């Protein structure tokens, strides 16, 4: 069974993924289409906060991810890998109460489920390096 937080992350991932193919539409509106009555109030609030945070910090998030792509550009990544990395990088940097290991494990699970057979390992490698060098110090104590 999926936890409310896992379902929330999946909703955010799905909104980011769909936005890649629906660029003319507002990302927040796409999220609202995904959030139905099966999501509780907190999950909806969290998902909206994540989407706002990702939108507001997208350039910085993308630049940070790009620093760790060896012989790749962000645009060459699969849509799945790119958006899993965006979601998890946001969570690593801005969601102070979520342990690093939880963020990375959840991202790996989404990548494995929706990506290629190599997506989980790829996402793990990038996020591990981002976490070690950029996650707030207090997250290492959670």
Swiss-Prot record:
GO term, biological process aspect, one: DNA-templated transcription termination
Keywords, in A-Z order: RNA-binding, Transcription, Transcription antitermination, Transcription regulation
The UniProt record lists the keyword Kinase: no
InterPro entries in the cross-refs: NusB-like_sf, NusB_fam, NusB_RsmB_TIM44
GO molecular function: RNA binding
Cellular component terms (Gene Ontology): cytosol
Pfam families per record: NusB (PF01029)
CDD domains the UniProt entry points to: Terminator_NusB
Quaternary assembly: Monomer or homodimer; in equilibrium, with a preference for the monomer. Dimerization may be employed to package NusB in an inactive form until recruitment into antitermination complexes.
Function, in words: Involved in transcription antitermination. Required for transcription of ribosomal RNA (rRNA) genes. Binds specifically to the boxA antiterminator sequence of the ribosomal RNA (rrn) operons.
Family affiliation: Belongs to the NusB family.
HAMAP family, alphabetized: NusB
Protein name according to UniProt: Transcription antitermination protein NusB
Organism for this UniProt entry: Thermotoga maritima (strain ATCC 43589 / DSM 3109 / JCM 10099 / NBRC 100826 / MSB8)
């Amino acid at each position: 069974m999926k936890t409310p937080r896992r379902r929330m992350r999946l909703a955010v991932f799905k909104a980011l993924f769909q936005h890649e193919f629906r660029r003319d539409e507002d990302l927040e509106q796409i999220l609202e289409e995904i959030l139905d009555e099966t999501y509780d109030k907190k999950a909806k609030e969290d998902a909206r906060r994540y989407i706002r945070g990702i939108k507001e910090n997208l350039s910085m998030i993308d630049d940070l991810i790009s620093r760790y792509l060896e012989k790749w550009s962000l645009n060459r990544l699969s849509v799945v890998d790119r958006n899993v990395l965006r979601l998890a990088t946001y969570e690593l940097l801005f969601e102070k109460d979520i342990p690093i290991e939880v963020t990375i494990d959840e991202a790996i699970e989404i990548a494995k489920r929706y990506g290629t057979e190599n997506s989980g390992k790829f996402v793990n490698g990038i996020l591990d390096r981002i976490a070690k060098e950029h996650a707030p110090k207090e997250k290492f104590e959670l």
